């Protein structure tokens, strides 16, 4: 069991060897402390100066609906359904 202070979080201690799959128990007060430390998307950080939590790159996560939309389908080229088989390159020294 490892106890870590929320205000002094170290990613190398939290995720040993770069593996983020450790079992972590977070309390409600630790989430409040993280909100004060890093802020949320609606309010800026109280404890860090000039730090804003970055916004998501993708606001709509329904990727299949986006990819099947008419705007995207018009921009894509038609699929190439013709299968081109590779010719067998014969070795003249072995195949006499």
UniProtKB/Swiss-Prot annotation:
InterPro entries per record: Ribos_uL4_C_dom (IPR025755), Ribosomal_uL4_dom_sf (IPR023574), Ribosomal_uL4_euk/arch (IPR045240)
Basic residues bias (residue ranges): 79-96
Species lineage: Eukaryota, Metazoa, Chordata, Craniata, Vertebrata
Record's function text: Component of the large ribosomal subunit. The ribosome is a large ribonucleoprotein complex responsible for the synthesis of proteins in the cell.
Entry coiled-coil feature ranges: none
Subcellular location: Cytoplasm
Gene Ontology BP annotations: translation
Chief location category: cytoplasm
Keywords: Cytoplasm, Ribonucleoprotein, Ribosomal protein
Name of the protein in question: Large ribosomal subunit protein uL4
UniProt record similarity statement: Belongs to the universal ribosomal protein uL4 family.
Quaternary structure, from the entry: Component of the large ribosomal subunit.
């Amino acid at each position: 069991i490892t106890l870590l202070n929320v205000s002094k979080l170290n990613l190398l201690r939290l995720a040993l060897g770069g593996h983020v799959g450790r079992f972590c128990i977070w309390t409600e007060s630790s989430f409040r402390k993280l909100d004060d430390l890093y802020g949320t998307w609606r309010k800026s950080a109280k404890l860090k100066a000039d730090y804003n939590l970055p916004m998501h790159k993708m606001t709509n996560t329904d990727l299949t609906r986006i990819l099947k939309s008419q705007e995207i389908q018009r921009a894509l080229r038609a699929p190439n359904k013709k299968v081109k088989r590779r010719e067998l390159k014969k070795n003249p020294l072995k195949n006499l």
